[in-house]
Amino acid sequence: MSKLKLTLTAAVAAGALTVAAGCGSGGGESEESAKWRTATSVEDGGGMDALVSAAQAEGTLNVMGLYPDWANYGGLLDAFSEKYGIEINNDTSSGSSQDQINAVKNRQGQDSSLDYLDTGESFAVASTDEELLATYTPQTAGDLPEDMKSADGTWYNHLGGTVGIGCDDKAIDECPTSFADLLDPKYKGKVALPGDPTTGESGFMIVYAAALANGGSLDDIQPGIDYFAKLSDSGNLIPSEAVAGTVETGETPIVLNWDYLLLQWADNIKDKGVDFTTTIPSDGTVSSYYAASVNADAPHPAVARLWQEFVFSDEGQNLLLKGYVKPGRLEAMIDADTVNKDALGKLPEAATSEPAPQPNQKQRESQQKVLADNWAKAVG
């Protein structure tokens, strides 16, 4: 039986802040935990058996925002807990990247601090600069492309997705398959975004995808802004923020969003009679990945490293794949024939046949400024 504990309320999380550190990087830490705190790999710490033994002695994994119904985190946490007999404290009262960084900073030396962080890549980069993350290399990290891991070993891309087009197949006679298609007058009042591109990652990356579909590049997002100005002027783009519920009611029958979210929405509203399909735009798209990292001040340093090993193992990556995300090691697992083919087959073929481009940190920062300066003027 798994030992999964969800901390669901802010009050509980706040109360946890008062707990003194029994296992943190301060006094009272066991010799084995102290050894693993400085270990940069399984080999450096004495091998996998030694890591498992030390982790089981610590007994608990503290994480935040790993919502059970997102990316199959529920299945991943259960499998880890059952395999190693480790209790999971999963604080789901909050969970944004910034929330996790704040928790790490505010809970220094406390039992309640996080062992593991699951953040946007830009947050991992910033956290590395602030020396909040431990250097630790999972055994399978060599399978990751160089642009999907930090040079100093503080973070690794474990899951991600591709911008796609979701469409209510019953409400729309012919679903669009490209950004160009979305400009067709027959889609007037039908197309929606998940939110304001100037304040949200999803919207920002959707504009990036539109730029690549219209002659832009990862260094030039302006064609994407111009595209959405045209889509808005045509009346095709509506101001509603799309969620699964607005698809179900028919308010937003066509939605641009991450493929893994669209696929999850389809599952959630299928029993409502909605046939929601997901297509990767044929004329251009982008991908984006989350970063997995270990808190340098983790109260359970051996557990944190064992969890990192599990996330990047074949088992862990396949469990994430069941949640419709693209595991970081997907290409290597396909080559090694260790991928779950049934789960892989549920992803759009175009999302897995060829990796979509992903902007680097410098490109993100420069183009976010372009978007912030020009979106409201162009689209309103």
Positions of PLM-derived features:
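Sec-dependent bacterial lipoprotein signal peptides
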Residues: M1-A21
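Short, polar/charged alpha-helical segment
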Residues: G46-Q56, L66-E87
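Extracytoplasmic ligand-binding site segments that recognize negatively charged/polar headgroups
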Residues: N62-L77, N89-K105, D111-E251
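A ligand-binding cleft/hinge motif common to bilobed small-molecule-binding domains
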Residues: F123-A126, E248, I254-V274
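Extracellular/periplasmic bilobal clamshell ligand-binding domains
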Residues: A336-G380
